[in-house]
């Protein structure tokens, strides 16, 4: 039944803008589940681990036409921009989305941030992207700018941090509150509560987070893979990955009620047919690995039949992501490495995915 349910695109609603500023006990517990690799002894006083993501970069898009311009290119609604109002919570200032090519395949995965600054009524947004495609994303945006009153420019002065809890929160844990002030933004990750918070700042991340410590970037990527979160061009190869196979719906990254955008036709048609035969699954690798790791694109094989189940996409150590046919995920799988070694593969369905996908 689980495999059958995974064939259908489970709909996930966008989060309500009426999120609470302070983490609730339930959300805190959800954030910390599965964080064994980030665990810290509570006695040492550390509550949060901060990871500086030098592999992520920021592009600023501003101007009177910034909002309609971005709406016509991205898969999702835009986050709020402009000065805070009593009706809007800072949580609504971040949104996850993909930019697609005309064939409907993913070019860039981005987190959009609506900035509080607003000059003469002109909104301003920051787009977080893989740093290796910073120039390509700017070129992509400029290509569609035409005569719109929009300025596209990098923001190298700001750094992106991921902030994750070390252990489940208790009444003694220092809670985080969302901040949108000056050059600092501390916002809940819009993809899933499991990914904690995003921090944009010119300053040192741990210094801004109560009881924060600097984390090892490899731990961040291992945890991200365990949760099934693709991020960047290694996980989402430009022009190859399909947004719904990449679980864009599960990560709150697409709106099926917004206006038209580049690449919409294939995404909308797939959604309305309700059948997604392949998905990007988190996988565990068992057995000795080659010194260079498993190669991206390595064929994942159904052990019992020898048929191809899909392809390994990317990973860190013994965890990673693989694009697999949903009906094959329960059976024993393996990868034959370039050194002719067999590596056992176990596909995992994350427990934060919608019930219909389990």
Curated annotation (Swiss-Prot):
Transit peptide limits: 1-94
Transit peptide listed as a keyword: yes
Gene3D superfamilies: Probable tRNA modification gtpase trme, domain 1 (3.30.1360.120)
Positions carrying N6-acetyllysine: 222, 311
GO CC term (a single one): mitochondrion
GO biological process, alphabetically ordered: heme biosynthetic process
The family this protein is said to belong to: Belongs to the GcvT family. CAF17/IBA57 subfamily.
Annotated protein name in UniProt: Iron-sulfur cluster assembly factor IBA57, mitochondrial
Organism: Mus musculus (Mouse)
